[in-house]
């Protein structure tokens, strides 16, 4: 699998309280190059993923404010199985690592530099993985598609 040293942004994303891990099976992976705080940008893709019934991993520079609150509420209500982690690395190295994750999972990096806006993201831009395991310190992506 592909592993990096960033864990879940919020412990509310944990799926197994005993091991304090978040495990997502047959997941979509949204890879975003920027900070996500505006929930309006995130809602269109959340709704598309929710309709598939599959879980979603969000990898972004950060997820904060109302966007994070919305993810937590959806997770707690059972509307959407979701977890968010910060992107690994910094600066140009982060860009390379996000490209690597996109390559491993068959996804696209949502980057405004490249002309992709988060609010226009579609399911076809998302990566896929058989299994994602997240602890407070690290994320492992297994069986990228």
Curated annotation (Swiss-Prot):
Its EC number is 5.6.1.7. Keywords: ATP-binding, Chaperone, Cytoplasm, Isomerase, Nucleotide-binding. It comes from the Bacteria. GO terms for molecular function: ATP binding; ATP-dependent protein folding chaperone; isomerase activity. It catalyses: ATP + H2O + a folded polypeptide = ADP + phosphate + an unfolded polypeptide. It is an enzyme of class 5 (isomerase). GO terms for cellular component: cytoplasm. InterPro entries: Cpn60/GroEL, Cpn60/GroEL/TCP-1, GroEL-like_apical_dom_sf. It is found in: Cytoplasm. Its main location: cytoplasm. GO terms for biological process: protein refolding. Pfam families: Cpn60_TCP1 (PF00118). Coiled coil: none annotated. Belongs to the chaperonin (HSP60) family. Together with its co-chaperonin GroES, plays an essential role in assisting protein folding. The GroEL-GroES system forms a nano-cage that allows encapsulation of the non-native substrate proteins and provides a physical environment optimized to promote and accelerate protein folding. Forms a cylinder of 14 subunits composed of two heptameric rings stacked back-to-back. Interacts with the co-chaperonin GroES. This is Chaperonin GroEL.
